[in-house]
Amino acid sequence: TAQSRQEAQESGKKWFPCNKGGSFRKWYGNNDFLVNWKNDGEEIRAFKDENGKLRSRPQNMDFYFREGITWSTLSIGQLSMRFSPKGHLFETKGSVLFFNSEEMLIYVLGLVNSVVIYELLQVLCPTVDFHEGPIGKIPVLISHDDMDLVIRVVHQNIEASKQDWDSYETSWDFKQSLLVNGKNLTAAYT
């Protein structure tokens, strides 16, 4: 993957990861989609209907390829947010929050995946649509006393979720099934 739009364009590559939401999954994962972003999205940006009207209008392209927090804006249950590493694009159903520091990104990821925020979102967002408006209204209380602990626990959660995600053959970083590590099915999952 690329670390910036310029790097993506200079690479000459065609396909890049894209956040499009997905099923309930906290901390990491739902990395399922690729998008044709060759030549800075030339084909997508020029895509027109039969009347010549533009059908696609990518937004906020300066934020493409940055790390952030992504989530599925439509959910029938609890909101789940995930770490999105550098190198991904995003679209409307796979929104992304961006931060000026990785420390704040990780801290806020811990906050938004908490039970407290879930209860708050029941008031701010009583429907199944967790779009940017209600998410942007979430109050962020920064506890400097607890920040190191929260960041450490969130990193552990991301790593555990990434290991789980990568144990499936559909993961781009798949190496080996968990079943291979155990002598039988019970041993593989205990």
Identify the residue ranges that each predicted region occupies.
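Polyanionic (Asp/Glu-rich) segments that form extended negatively charged tracts
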Residues: 188-190
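Polybasic, glycine- and aromatic-enriched phosphate-binding surface used to engage nucleic acids
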Residues: 1-159, 163-183
